[in-house]
């Protein structure tokens, strides 16, 4: 299991924030509410916990699944000033991965494949959802972003009325108006 930790440069220590995550691939901090959001590839969900918390376990007291049943495997996260959480998707949902979700060995093998092999096996379809936006205040889904570029969204950044996307394997930056 992966542990999300925090480094204290003054004390030169690392403290565990959340354990029991099967593939932490993105973090976002809501400074207003001091909530930390963590994308989990293995569980296809977004966990949330207080930013000041230490020693939590995903799904346990103080660390709940805020958004689950996602259409793909979440990657990068970003949060705008209105507390809208943007979730990028690395891969489309995969029946093979879902069937073998209980096997830490097979899941580990899939996560350690080369990026090009992962893209070939689990790539998002041309018209698939690359990213979504959800209100953390209400839990309502605001936007879905789909598009023609092949590859998964490896980075995203909301700026005013646009969202910028980095697509794995592409030599261009994409954007969408919101």
Identify the residue ranges that each predicted region occupies.
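Loop/turn-rich, solvent-exposed surfaces of beta-rich toroidal or solenoidal domains
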Residues: 74-142
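A short beta-strand motif characteristic of beta-propeller blades
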Residues: 13-18, 62-67, 140-146
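Conserved beta-strand positions in repeat-built beta-propeller and related beta-rich domains
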Residues: 20, 30, 36-43, 87-91, ...
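Short, catalytically relevant binding-site loops at active-site mouths
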Residues: 22-24, 43-45, 53-54, 71-75, ...
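Short loop/turn segments that connect beta-strands within beta-propeller blades
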Residues: 8-12, 50-54, 135-139, 177-178
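Blade-level signature of beta-propeller repeat domains, shared across WD40, Kelch, NHL, RCC1
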Residues: 153-178
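Structural signal for beta-propeller blades
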Residues: 4, 44-46, 93-95, 131, ...
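Beta-rich, blade/repeat-based domains predominating
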Residues: 3, 17-35, 69-83, 128, ...
